[in-house]
């Protein structure tokens, strides 16, 4: 299926080809620059317009009529699930993540974080599994919020656009989908609840949500699958934020050889 504009949604991946024995988690400790819980505890003060605007409140969430809105992101369950630096998911994909200390690499057009960052990769892989978390808003719907570029040693690269609501959700909630007015034209995203460590693509039903508002207690990361050219040697991955007023972070990369 396609959207009303005839544009196919950006795929998040179906995770049907996961081979746990071939999965290699990438050590990202040197590029982590924050705790995922920091996202709405910061003050995003620049760049800002010097004039009266309807821009986001300084905490990075909310709107002009809800200036004090926030969301308490709690990663205690995720950290409690980590064993010897590894998070095992029910999809069979392990991610390297610390039980203590910084556990995400954030990017943003706000000055709090770099616009982009680079993560070294090695060897060859058929796909990359990404554990990501960040913010997005109504104004960033149906546009590229950010982009993942995986470069090979020959200078070429593969790209994965991060588009709300195709494959880029807000950390504080899951999407309401009814197949009608609220139709993503794509399978539901796999989300990892940070407060419990649970993974599912059906939290709407499992958590008993009945209305449109579906805020997740503690927040949730998202799992994405990115196909790669298995015949080429990898060089590095670049995460870049493209849209104003969002924060995009990567918590884990696992390569399937």
Regions found by a protein language model. Name each.
Residues 1-257:
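N-terminal/edge-of-domain interface segments
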